[in-house]
Amino acid sequence: CIRDRLITWRELGYHTCIKRANYDQYQSLPDWAIKTLDDHANDEREYIYDLSEFTNANTHDEIWNAAQNQLKTEGRIHNYLRMLWGKKILEWTPNPQIALSYLIDLNDRFALDGRDPNSYSGVFWILGRYDRAWGPERPIYGKIRYMTSKSTATKFNLKPYLEKWSVGSTV
């Protein structure tokens, strides 16, 4: 609902940043999220990227790269793709603490709303803030809400998006 996005979520983000000195720290996540992320921090990852590779949209995933290109060019990412963008950073970094540091860095550096309380709400939602535990428990994610590029392709018309934001798109 548009009212939720404009009022409820905006005010919740501001309230969290004003009332919690550690709003931008890993330890500010809900206990369940910290536990599940810590339980899976050492899970094997198929891909690991460093901050430079993320910054330059140099991953194996065309959808993720397109989202990063949009972020760098326009200072924003389509809302649904922004969620996927963050979830993949969690999946492709050595542990959730590094993922969070990359998320904050990329968001603050490139997003028009970087450093805004709403932006921090979005970044921390990726790791479980303002969400609930989800099942089944999965490697890397644990009980954190899971998203894939494949499932995104079924919910979002990617062809024009990839034509605009990908390098050498074949979609």
What are these regions (language model features)?
Residues A67, W85-K88, P94, L127, ...:
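Active-site proximal loops enriched in glycine and acidic residues that flank catalytic Cys/His/Asp
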Residues Y26-E44, L51-F54, A99-V167:
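C-terminal, helix-dominated tail/subdomain
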Residues R3-Y14, K72-S121:
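Structured ligand/cofactor/substrate-binding pocket environments in proteins
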Residues T170-V171:
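Charged, low-complexity, intrinsically disordered terminal regions
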Residues C1-I2, E163:
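N-terminal targeting leaders only when they are immediately followed by extended low-complexity/repeat-rich tracts
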